[in-house]
Amino acid sequence: TMEAATRFKDVDQFYIPWSFDYRGRAYPIPAFLSPQDTDFGKSLIRFVEPAYLTPDSEDWLAFQVATTYGLDKATMQERLDWVKNNSTLIGAVALDPIGNRTEWEEVEEPWQFLAACEEYYHCVMLKDRDHTSLMISTDATCSGLQILAGLARDESTAKLVNVVPSDTPQDAYKVVAMHARPNCPKEYQYFMDRKVLNVQ
């Protein structure tokens, strides 16, 4: 990623070519500097055409800060509240990332958190920018089930995989683990959680 970033650092813009498989899934062709890169690689990506700030876009910047910190299972309101209550932390990380690295290097997605803090600080707190080009990460939840729920118009499955609105993000893997646990040998039940089912 560092080699790719060094190679592109003086380029005004570059394009990311995509490949589609037989299921309709899209994959970026480059291994580095793409929306499916590592945390570090994702943190470097900016859109060429910025979006001008609105109250909604400010909320989405806050969403990115909280999500990359580790609140990906929290409601939108909980994430917004967390950002509001942690503005001192966000400002400290944005202004002095080296001096405050212990505040961010152990979070869920440290590099994206650092990038989000810097963007949020300038766009929302300091207001010295009226636009943002930061990539906001949203992720599909068990995309195969999302497609099937949509095709079958199955509302219960759609809710389970976050196709229909819900205050709290749903977790299909956790629900399957809860239902499978009683049917597994007792010595394995303690270890049954969503991660057991989410193995590739």
Give the residues covered by each predicted segment.
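Short, positively charged, Gly/Tyr-enriched micro-motifs
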Residues: V196-Q200
